[in-house]
């Protein structure tokens, strides 16, 4: 997971672009806060990065507030849903035809399609609220979870599997943990 733009700071997509030239094998999980960039521009940027990385790009969908803009949890997930649907249209179709609450678009898609010809980079998503879980079940590829008890993780995985099956989809699972490695225990 690349430096996240969850807090205003380093731009994750710029960081990934810089790392593309100095790496050959590592895959990058770039956090993208939905609503920060106009979705057609975001689709083009991600497609370009995917080519630079020769398919080593994955995207972590973030549904947080934007600086100076406060939305309810359900509104943030609704905005993320619209962004994802526009990304997918941009990556797989010749036109974007979208009429949502946050975006109304009718335009040709960018000629740059992702390097990954399976619909674009894998979309990762983490969140426990019902709106977030539904969004992941319908549109994302990997459900990220935090360390929990084995029983809670199994319950989350079972719930996601059931919700995804309602959309005739399979979702993979990931566990986000932070590992601190030092020479000694004291460090």
Residue ranges and their predicted role:
Residues 1-187:
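Active-site-adjacent structural elements that line small-molecule/cofactor binding pockets in enzymes
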